[in-house]
Each structure stands twice: as structure tokens, then as C-alpha cells.
Amino acid sequence: MANSMNGRNPGGRGGNPRKGRILGIIDAIQDAVGPPKQAAADRRTVEKTWKLMDKVVRLCQNPKLQLKNSPPYILDILPDTYQHLRLILSKYDDNQKLAQLSENEYFKIYIDSLMKKSKRAIRLFKEGKERMYEEQSQDRRNLTKLSLIFSHMLAEIKAIFPNGQFQGDNFRITKADAAEFWRKFFGDKTIVPWKVFRQCLHEVHQISSGLEAMALKSTIDLTCNDYISVFEFDIFTRLFQPWGSILRNWNFLAVTHPGYMAFLTYDEVKARLQKYSTKPGSYIFRLSCTRLGQWAIGYVTGDGNILQTIPHNKPLFQALIDGSREGFYLYPDGRSYNPDLTGLCEPTPHDHIKVTQEQYELYCEMGSTFQLCKICAENDKDVKIEPCGHLMCTSCLTAWQESDGQGCPFCRCEIKGTEPIIVDPFDPRDEGSRCCSIIDPFSIPMLDLDDDDDREESLMMNRLASVRKCTDRQNSPVTSPGSSPLAQRRKPQPDPLQIPHLSLPPVPPRLDLIQKGIVRSPCGSPTGSPKSSPCMVRKQDKPLPAPPPPLRDPPPPPERPPPIPPDSRLSRHFHHGESVPSRDQPMPLEAWCPRDAFGTNQVMGCRILGDGSPKPGVTANSNLNGRHSRMGSDQVLMRKHRRHDLPSEGAKVFSNGHLAPEEYDVPPRLSPPPPVTALLPSIKCTGPIANCLSEKTRDTVEEDDDEYKIPSSHPVSLNSQPSHCHNVKPPVRSCDNGHCILNGTHGTPSEMKKSNIPDLGIYLKGEDAFDALPPSLPPPPPPARHSLIEHSKPPGSSSRPSSGQDLFLLPSDPFFDPASGQVPLPPARRAPGDGVKSNRASQDYDQLPSSSDGSQAPARPPKPRPRRTAPEIHHRKPHGPEAALENVDAKIAKLMGEGYAFEEVKRALEIAQNNLEVARSILREFAFPPPVSPRLNL
């Protein structure tokens, strides 16, 4: 097997059998002694290798050879290898860098191996002579094997030197357990000798004999150079997963299984199965040469056709078992005996992802749960994409891949594998009295609080107390997550008291509840689409965005409406004396636009979300285990109904019908934050709307529960900006640090619970629920998020179907059109580099935070009442002249006094056009935050 994989002449069909045997003996000795020390791979050596490669190409261009243009096509592989080597040399052009490259251990081994393989191919032509032109000859077969080796070498050099820069010491092994093994034994080495690798592997997985070791080497050593690279190790562990039983799986699938074909090509599979065309169910499987790390299974269909498929999201043995049960894979290589692989299906422990208190509270405030899939909002997450770490449900991932979706639906990272996971819901009882916990109605079935009613009431009271104290908090709890999800076995769960609220996870919408018209959300609107999600970008890792083009400062906001006499509904919105209807006050930018909020239209999108959707500081207490909590009342629930409408309007406005569900699992956008003035035009409304704004605001408490909605017949338009609408200013927070006490308003959690459900049902079902899976079209640049609020589409404007099968339909226009209000589909519509600009960007969402900063989970501010209209959302903002004339130096000093660096403050003010509130929001999202004051234990 080793001989055939190394492309050697086996001896029986070559030009010189005796010479072939001698070469085999020499190679065996080299294998035993170990590979020789490699010479430096300087430019001269590389150019010599190029000449040999060129000679191989010319030999393969002989018309008599009649090579088929199908993978692996050596006439494409060698030129591509040449081009990539040129790219590498261009990145190390000066003498110092070139010397560094020539001494790179991996590069030396690679060039030496490439030179030897090229010489072997040339020798093959010399010895094979006319037999090379016979398609069925052994010499021709050896050339095909060499083509496969060259193909593997090309894939490896591209993986180790992406874009020409060496990244071997940072290579990301897909399987976590395998990655731990490599780090433990080899550190950051890129390549190790086979002999060393074998000894280390034997310590973890016992290798029974030398014969087994030889066979194992022939499987792992894809480039046949007597070394094992981190790339080859990653491929092997993906092919024969799971790691815990990897050698057993390999023995069953590669050593003893009659259907396994080593180093076979697509055409050879078809040719081999052709003789079984009258025996449907015959199959063989091989390593895919175009998608290394995956299997390709060829089989004969009932009508005699030969098809080849690559199974997704499951180990090979599971794919073979499923295919056998369905009648597709019955006769391996035409044989009647089909091995029973069910013994490999022993249940393996799932990754357990534990929801922290901060994550739990944030999701409650947004009306959802961490474990809910952000794409369909119906199923719980049960699979993790590797290596990016995004979480979703299996059905969504399968549908995405079957719709030809490329890579992760959120970040477009290559899907190298999947891992089953279980999300352990947060149980407040586990936290004791150290923190104020919010009961998650969607995780209640797992908490079973029916026999702990006293506990439940106590939790609700604690939550209410924390809401009342939220004005004293210095940081908004609704901040972005700080890290990726880590399985419990891979990283210990941080103490909830030590987790900063900067590491809170993104929030999904409850599309399933909205579509069914069920008011289960504890805090209202699932308006946040991943595109407009406030919690998407990693604060610590993301640089401040470039300042946007200057826009005029917004005029002062209109006067706050006169106080409304308290009644049963009013009292639920006022938790202290300075309260006003919360709908008049938007969510603070810090709270709703945490890192990602500053894409050009996100700040305003966050405001709309802030008004109609769950607020930080508002927690889920409306539904406890399917029942209303003691803190809620029928009137409160009725109040919630009224608040459905606006958030849904805001939700659809966010991205032309694309709601928050998409952003929550998407890597952060790094689009520059627009000044508030850039956002204000987008919220300026038409005359009819503007005229009724203040009146509607004043009538908030008295109106019926189902009346609260911006009329869909008056879409908010950028082009329609009456002078009386120019009063719109950025939202004012009674707390400058991003708390949700907007205008001193506090909404009860139950008010917000249902706030957006009716309208969201329209938009989430029609558009957002299915846009969460981005198309495979190239994503547009981040600024495409401008129309977050710029155009408020009528409920019926969605053009996408709402069936589950349409979940992955691609939109016709991936880019935002300012005139038409078209907005890109959320999850993947970003420039290719967007998803990786932050260190954790591709795995930040839906992942457990790994950082902690010694502060308890922050108290959640109260939930303001929904704002009615755009102009009145900024009541407590300082009035025009005072804000406009405020000294810039004073603002800088104030922000620096909060713990931010001078350069960060200066840049943030420049971006915000000297708006203190927006600058503070930007700093919260993009700069390291000041220390958080500890929350009170209640």
C-alpha cells in the first residue's frame, strides 16, 4: 500500500523490475532511519525545482498521452503550484526575508519533496516509454497517483502559506481534541518527522504493530515525504473522526472495508463501478481530491447510472449506515458482504455549552434564548460548525448545504467539520444569591420551577429591584460578546460574577413564536436581525472605524410631552419619578449598537430596536414555564400587545425586511459608524407621520393595545424630510454609560414581552427567517447597511417566500440601493474580509464568553415604552445650542475621565462629529471599556 501511494513502480509492470525493488529497499531504509536533514531552500533551489516542474508539464502535454481534463489534472496543478511559489517569493523579496524563508523548516521540506516528485515523474516517462500512452497500464496509473500527490501538495502549500504568507504555526486544526493533541506534543510546529509523530500518537492511541504503522503512514502522509504536517494531520482527523476512536474508525473504514479505494480519482471510480452497472447498490468510497478532508462515495443507482456524492455533516460510517438503510450503499466494490459499521456509532459525549448569566439575561431582554437557532428560530442549536464555531440546528445547516451554500452560513468560513453540541440552559438557582437572575421562559422546561414558586417570586423581585437601580449603573448590560463558544471540556465555565457584560452573546429573534402569534417573548421584539443586532462586534478586538463623511448636526429635539397622569398602564412604565413614556426615548447606542451598531445605518437601527424591542434592564418575567409571572398582569400583557407594531416596523426597516436573527450569528461588520446626523435623515419621516408624532407620544398610555404602530402606508423615507422632523437628535440616556433608562423611563419586563410580535410575524416570516442564511453571492461591503431605518417598508413589501424550503433562496440584489431601499441579506453580505477583521469575528456569535472582569452580571435597566415616531425618540437630548456649542476639549476630558485613551476619544468624537453620546457609544463598542462598577447582590 505504501508503495502504491508513493507512486513507486511496484516492480512487476515497470521498465526495470530489479531497479524498482532496489529503490523500494532504499526507501524502506530511509523510512526506518528517518528523513535526512534538508538543505536551505534558497531562490536558486526553488528555480531549479521550477525547471523540473516545467519539464514534467511538457512531457504531460504530449498529445499521445490524451490526459483528461478532470481532477487531478496535472497540467493545471503544476502551473498553479508554480504561481503560488512565485507569490510566496514575492512576499519574501528582500534578502533578510528570503533568508528567513529559506530556513523555514516546512518550506525546505516542501521544496525538497517537490523536486523529488518532479524527478520521479520524469523518470516515469523515461522508464515507461510507450506504456505511458496506454490508459490502462500500470505506468499510467503511477502517473495518476503522482498527479494526486501534486494535488495534495498544492492544497497543503496554499493552507500553510495563504496569500503567500507563512501561517503554519497558526494553522487551525478542525477537531478540538486533535488540536489539543498536536499542541501538547508538537506545540506550534508545522511539520514533524513520521517517526516522531508515530511515537507521540502511540502514547494516545496504541498502534498494534509495525505493519499497522506502515498502513497508517500511507493514509496520513498524503504528500508522501516521510513527514506529517499539521495540514495532513487535520485532514486525517476529519476523515476518520471522532478523535477518541480514530484508529478504530480507520481500521474499519480504510484497512478492512472492501469499499475503500486509496488514491483513486473521479474517473477511476466511474470506471471501476462500470462493471457493476447492473448491480444497483454497488459502491466504493475514496478521499475527495478536490475537497480534502471529505469523502466521496460513488454508487450505482437503480437505473444503472453511476453517481458520486460527498456526505455533509456526518462521519463516513454514519453516511454509509444511512445509505445502506436507504438502499443506496449495499455492495462494497460489488461484493455481497456489506460490513456492519453500527459498532462505530457508540454515542460520543457532546460538547456542552453552558449559558452564562450575562448571556441568559441578554437573551431574555431580547425575547429569546441562547439555545434557539438564529436561522429558523424554531429549533434549538444542536450542531457546531468547525473550525469557526458558529452554532445552529442541523436542519438549517443541511438545508443550507443542499442549496449549494458555500461555507458557514454566517461567516463563509470553510466548513471543515461539524460537532454535535448541547446547550445547557442557565439555571438561576445554580447562581445562588450572588446575582439577579431572570427566568428564561424558553428554557423553563429544563428548569422546572413548578415546585419552587417561592424561588420564582424571589427572582422576580430581585429582577425588579435591579431594574430600579439601573440608573446608577455605569455600563449597559447589552454589550457584545467577548469570545467564541467553548465547550465545557475545552474551557472551564467562568464565574458568572467574573464575566464582563462585554462578552454577552448576540440575540436571536423568536420567529417561531411570532409566526404563530404566541406571546412568549419575555421582553418583546425579536426585531434584531443579525444585520442590525446591537451585540455583534467584538469590542476589544475591533479597531475604531474610519470616520464617515461629515453631515450636518441634527437640530434639537422637540420638547418632551407633558407628563401623563399615572394609571395602571402608566405605572408599569414608570419605576421612578423622572420617568416618561419610554417610547419617546430610544435605546442608548451603547446598549443597542454594541460593536456592530455603527455600520452606517446601524445606530439608527439600534434606536428603533431599542424602542420597540426588549431593552437591557428588562428581563423575562412575563412567561415562566409557560405561565405569566407574578410581576405581570393582564393589563401588562395588553400593554405588550400594543408594542408589537413599531418594533416590527423597525425590524423590517432594519434591512429591508431582514431582521436581527441574521446578525446574531454573523461575524461582526467593521463598517465605520456614521455620525448621528448620518442616521437622522434615515429616520426622518413624511409629513403625515411627523405631524402626528408628538400627539401619538402623548397618547401612548391611553391608547388601545393593538393601536401602536407606525402606519405602513407612510414609509419612512430619506427623501421626505420636513422641517419639523429635523428635530430628531440622537437618543439621550439618563445614564451616559449606555443604560436603558431613556428619559428616565422604565418599562416593565412584561410590557416589552410582546411588543413586536404582530408586525414581526409579517417580516420575519416573509423575509428574515430565510435571509439568515446568506447567499453564496459575494457579500457587499459593510456600508451596505445604510438603510437600517432609511426605508420603512409596508408589511406586505417582502418579496421572499416564507416557506421553510425557501430559507436559502438568494436575493436578486446583494447590494444596498439607497434609492430603492434595498438592503443586502444579512448574514453574509459583507466584504470577504469583514468577517475576519476582528480576532474572534468568525466565531463570536452564539458562543460562550471566555473572558471575565470580576464584575457581577450588570443590573438590567428598565424597559422604556416604545417610541411612536422617529422625531420624538430623542426627548431628553440637550437642546440644539447647548449641545452644538459644547466645548470639544471638555468632551474629550469627560470621556478620558471615563477611562478611555486620548487617541480613541479624539477619533470617536471625530466620527461622531463631536456628539458626546455617540462618541461614548463608539468607545464602548470599539475601545476597551472603563471598569464596571459591581452590581448589588439582591
From Swiss-Prot:
Q: UBA domain location, by residue?
A: 887-926
Post-translational changes noted in the entry: Phosphorylated on tyrosine and serine residues upon TCR or BCR activation, and upon various types of cell stimulation.
Q: Where is this region: Linker?
A: 344-372
Q: Which PROSITE patterns match?
A: CBL_PTB, UBA, ZF_RING_1, ZF_RING_2
Q: Which residues carry this modification: Phosphoserine?
A: S282, S476, S480, S484, S521, S525, S529, S633
Name the job this protein performs: E3 ubiquitin-protein ligase which accepts ubiquitin from specific E2 ubiquitin-conjugating enzymes, and transfers it to substrates, generally promoting their degradation by the proteasome. Negatively regulates TCR (T-cell receptor), BCR (B-cell receptor) and FCER1 (high affinity immunoglobulin epsilon receptor) signal transduction pathways. In naive T-cells, inhibits VAV1 activation upon TCR engagement and imposes a requirement for CD28 costimulation for proliferation and IL-2 production.
| Name this protein carries in UniProt | E3 ubiquitin-protein ligase CBL-B
Species of provenance:
Rattus norvegicus (Rat)
Gene that this polypeptide is encoded by: Cblb
